[in-house]
A protein has these predicted regions:
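Short runs within selected transmembrane alpha-helices of multi-pass transporters and secretion channels
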Residues: 66-69, 141-160, 166-175, 182, ...
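Alpha-helical transmembrane segments of multipass membrane proteins
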Residues: 24, 28, 32, 58, ...
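Hydrophobic faces of transmembrane alpha-helices in multi-pass small-molecule transporters and flippases
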Residues: 3-34, 39, 60, 64, ...
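Small-residue-rich hydrophobic transmembrane alpha-helices
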Residues: 50-114, 148-170
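Helix-terminus/linker motif at the lipid-water interface of multi-pass membrane proteins
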Residues: 29-54, 60, 78-79, 118-125, ...
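Membrane-helix interface segments
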Residues: 46-47, 164-166, 193-194
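Transmembrane alpha-helix boundary and packing residues in multipass membrane permease domains
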Residues: 21, 25, 33, 37, ...
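Short alpha-helical transmembrane segments in multi-pass integral membrane proteins
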Residues: 1-18, 76-144, 187-220
Length: 220
């Protein structure tokens, strides 16, 4: 470390990605709280438990997709730094295709084995009544996985090239303007209740993910 010299420019470049990335995590937490609040309004705390358990399982299924996105971030950064835009485009396309295949497989497995998976999260006598509800929710949210590769690739490619603000904007549009607004519209305004909120989350995810994908394609 005796050769280390501080560089204000490098610190600024790091913070351009680090701060928006941190804000994205806060937004995702805010999304969860907003959905939970709406579920309490239209239903009961049981609906919150079902949603929480279902999304926890979906989050586990997203781990491979996050791994692919992290790899994309690294490759995209190297390609952008080397001015190799063709490699940037290729890595972006391949990550989406690979992620889509994985999400389709995981989504199908989740749909087929939803009752068995739900049982793992409601095995006690006190929570046994939640099993069919969690299984039903899983069969709805498995469609959520299909759109994840598009949105996550768009966000991570922007992070890879140092444009953290663009990645943050994608998250804001997807989580706040699409998922929360549509969940509120379908669940509360139109009166579809719990199912309306679930549908709003999925449709909002689709809209937000396609926006992120399209913006990243235009940028590349």
């Amino acid at each position: 470390f005796d050769q280390f010299k501080k560089s204000k420019g490098i610190v600024i470049e790091i913070m351009k990605v680090a701060i928006p990335s941190t804000a994205e995590q806060l937004i995702m937490s805010g999304l969860t709280m907003a959905i939970n609040a709406m579920l309490v309004i239209v239903s009961t705390t049981t609906a919150v438990a079902v949603y929480t358990a279902s999304m926890r399982i979906v989050s586990m299924a997203m781990i491979p997709l996050m791994g692919i996105a992290t790899a994309l971030l690294t490759v995209a950064g190297a390609a952008y730094g080397a001015r190799n835009y063709e490699k940037l485009k290729t890595s972006f396309t391949y990550s989406i295709k690979f992620g889509l295949v994985i999400s389709l497989i995981l989504g199908a497995l989740t749909f087929i084995f939803a009752p068995q998976i739900a049982l793992m999260f409601s095995y006690s006598a006190a929570t046994a009544y939640l099993t069919p509800q969690i299984a039903f929710a899983l069969r709805i949210f498995c469609f959520f996985l299909i759109f994840v590769p598009f949105g996550i690739a768009g966000s991570f490619v922007f992070q890879g090239v140092g444009k953290g603000t663009s990645s943050l904007l994608i998250t804001i549009i997807r989580s706040l303007f699409a998922e929360v607004v549509l969940a509120y519209l379908f669940g509360i305004v139109l009166g579809y209740g719990e199912m309306g909120i679930f549908a709003g989350v999925i449709i909002g995810s689709f809209i937000g993910s396609m926006f992120g994908y399209s913006w990243a394609r235009l940028f590349i």
